[in-house]
């Protein structure tokens, strides 16, 4: 019996897992600022985008406090102004699927399952047929491009994106030369 206890003790002492086990919920929420209010997806998406681009970590309340009005039916223009106030160069565009395919940085997009309720998420275009989606309401997930296009560019006329020019020196490969043509704010 003594030998069994010694072996059991040694087994317990030396069987330390070198990794942390995470739940599906933890994995899904990793890297995503979740929205705390029904219509605060814009603020949470901006915080998520900035956290992906910078070492500084923003919260949803940091962004909401910079907004000039409440979070009800926030527009790309208001999100752009908040980003500008925080010192980030940005511009909104309506772009085609072909242009979207060339993007390799996180961008904020407006998606619509129901035209009455637009929703803002952050997406990263991946090589192949998939897109990483950082949704303030649901969390992080992978979507096929066809599924994404069905809620971003339903009519094949182009979808709306807000492109933020990274200023972090750790991401020089993602520095963009934003086009000088008309943005959606110039209409």
Across the structure, where does each feature detected by a protein language model lie?
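Positively charged n-region of N-terminal signal peptides that target proteins for export
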Residues: 1-4
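Residues that form or flank phosphate/diphosphate-binding pockets in enzymes
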Residues: 41, 74, 118, 143
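Noncatalytic regulatory segments and standalone regulatory/sensor domains
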Residues: 126-187
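Active-site-adjacent substructure of cysteine-protease-like catalytic cores
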Residues: 64, 71, 80-136, 140
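Short alpha-helix boundary/capping motifs
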Residues: 31, 72-73
């Amino acid at each position: 019996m003594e030998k069994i206890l010694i072996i059991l003790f040694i087994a317990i002492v030396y069987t330390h897992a070198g990794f942390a086990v995470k739940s599906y919920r933890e994995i899904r929420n990793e890297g995503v600022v979740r929205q705390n209010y029904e219509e605060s997806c814009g603020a949470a998406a901006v915080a998520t985008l900035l956290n992906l681009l910078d070492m500084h970590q923003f919260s949803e309340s940091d962004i909401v406090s910079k907004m000039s009005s409440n979070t009800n039916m926030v527009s790309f223009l208001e999100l752009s102004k908040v980003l500008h106030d925080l010192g980030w160069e940005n511009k909104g565009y309506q772009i085609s699927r072909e242009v979207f395919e060339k993007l390799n940085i996180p961008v904020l997009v407006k998606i619509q399952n129901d035209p009455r309720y637009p929703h803002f998420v952050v997406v990263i275009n991946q090589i192949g047929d998939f897109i990483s989606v950082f949704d303030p309401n649901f969390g992080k997930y992978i979507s096929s491009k066809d599924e994404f296009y069905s809620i971003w560019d339903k009519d094949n006329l182009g979808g709306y994106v807000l492109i933020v020019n990274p200023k972090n020196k750790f991401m020089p490969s993602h520095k963009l030369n934003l086009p000088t043509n008309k943005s959606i704010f110039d209409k």
